[in-house]
């Protein structure tokens, strides 16, 4: 199997992953992350299962991209791929928690996930200072290097960077930004990642030497 065929096969990971990222924020119960009724609902489980599946699919897509690009990649691109991989580990871990453990907590100890519960008071430092920045910077860095490599068009880069930046706009109960920021963040970032997969699938070329 050639490197090009591996890239085209694994590019489906970026396409599906982008769809799942968009699904995560668009399906998620509107208005807030808090509340036992939200956290235990089928809608919540569907949204955060998309969150978890997005991480798995995007990691699979990155494997093919690494096969194609890493042998001749510069330091910047290599670092961006490693950062994106780390971002997917963190993103997948939080997705496993919110899709499986969170609904159990909501059903059996719902007061924990209320706005004034232990899940949000004090505010979760891991989410604010590690998970969100790593995800946002990891996505933006990978998309930027793919644009520089002439794989991704500028429109996709802009959509992805704007979406990644919106991850830094926390909504209720973490802060007061409108929920539309969260919904749009995943929609735009997911569009850009799916666009990357489409570009790789239909125009995969060997790494520049």
What are these regions (language model features)?
Residues 1-209:
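Hydrophobic, aromatic-enriched alpha-helical segments typical of multi-pass transmembrane helices
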